[in-house]
Amino acid sequence: MRIVFTFIIVFSSISIVQAQLGGESTYQFLNLMSSPRQAALGGKVLTNVDYDVTQAIYNPATINIEMDNQLAINYSSYLGDIRYGTAAYAYTVDRRTQTFHVGMTYVDYGSFDGYDENGVSTGTFTGNEAALSVGYARQIGYSDFYFGANLKFITSKLEQYSSFGIATDIGFIYINEYLDFNAALVVRNFGTQLSTYAGMKESLPLEIDLGLSQMLENVPIRWHLTFENLQKWPISYPNPARSITDLNGNQTEEKVSFISNLFRHTILGVELFPEKGFNLRLGYSFRRSQELKILEQRNFSGLSFGIGLKFNNIRFSYTHARYSSAANTSF
């Protein structure tokens, strides 16, 4: 009952919080992909319940005994020479108290040249951000439902300005072992700034995601379907390149349809041989494709692909994600 009560309180609070997307809130790095596997499957996956200890950074309900004593370290050369990495570790105290999880995300924005309002150089400065999370999950009674939560401590330093914050992720997952089907609902980054950059309090990038996945019966493929940013339906913005100008010079901007909005909330992913020592991964983000593609070129924006290899007790994963003709990332 206490779990259900907490769930109701959180969602009641969310209903009075304005939905936030990129550029509308602080600590945006909290929504960076947590692993190459996640990046390869389109950028967001909520339903992997296996050895993958980094999955719990996005959905704490997936913390399970298979993660016991698993350590993951990931590094990405991101856009604009930004470097970031994640690390995660899980430990099972005993089968009754189950498994605890610790996760870390760190972003280094590099060095910048500073200038004052008169164009006089003020030297170089740096920027970096980090988040440390502690998570735990447990089964709800004897049902097929599991509940988990992460508590995150956030620090950010941009030039001479710094900020600290605290947030929580709350996740639920339904696991049907007979059908090999999982469904998850996650509320991420529900929190506040404890100290601000310059006296003005900013909201955190609150996000509600829904994920589904299933292992096909006769084919070694697990499909993933994720609906992201459910807290805000009109997620798309008109593309100026698609505006129409009539003979009188009047301009009509692009109208974003219901179907277009629906697809921009959608991420698809498939994993071939997910339980073997070698597997292939492919993902597609409709939103990334629509927002970053160039109309006159076919550059496969939104597409990502990767591989996974296992050597004894060590796993290696690599992913390449397409953003635009000018920028792609490796993880």
Annotated model-derived regions:
Residues M1-E24, V270:
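Bacterial Sec-dependent N-terminal signal peptides
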Residues Q20-F331:
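Subset of outer-membrane beta-barrel
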